[in-house]
Amino acid sequence: MIFRTNYIVIFIVSIFISMLWQPVHLSVFVILIVAWLYVYSRDNEPWVIFGSVIDDSTLVLVLLVLTIGIFLLTDVSRGIVIGVLAGLPVVLVHGMCRRNTEMLFVLEDDEEKVAMNTSSSSLSSSS
């Protein structure tokens, strides 16, 4: 959960590298990334267009439809598939390694809780 943004960045960079030889597709991809980043990094104030309030879910839906439409029009699917396939092993290996260390932290936390419960119960019984 913590590394979700990092995983997305890895996929975006691998897609970006796979599109270096297709400058039109790359520029479209960069424009879409900027649009998505703007949607997620802006303030939570709703947009007002022609007197109508546009909420975030509508904005995300419009951007999603626009993204899919542009991907279909520019035939960028091959570059995206190559980029995702290049980034997938990195993310999977990291996910497997991180899971093992996460389990160690869970075990350490459990041991600390048991030690704290034992010490608190011995303090309460001695008073």
Swiss-Prot record:
Main localization, broad class: endoplasmic reticulum
InterPro entries xref list: Prenylated_rab_accept_PRA1
GO annotation, cellular component aspect: endoplasmic reticulum; endoplasmic reticulum membrane
Bilayer topology term: Multi-pass membrane protein
Entry keyword set: Endoplasmic reticulum, Membrane, Transmembrane, Transmembrane helix, Transport
One GO BP: vesicle-mediated transport
Short name of one Pfam family: PRA1
Listed transmembrane segments: 15-35, 53-73, 76-96
Compartments in which it is found: Endoplasmic reticulum membrane
Function: May be involved in both secretory and endocytic intracellular trafficking in the endosomal/prevacuolar compartments.
Similarity-based family: Belongs to the PRA1 family.
Name of the protein in question: PRA1 family protein C
Taxonomic placement: Eukaryota, Viridiplantae, Streptophyta, Embryophyta, Tracheophyta
Gene: PRA1C
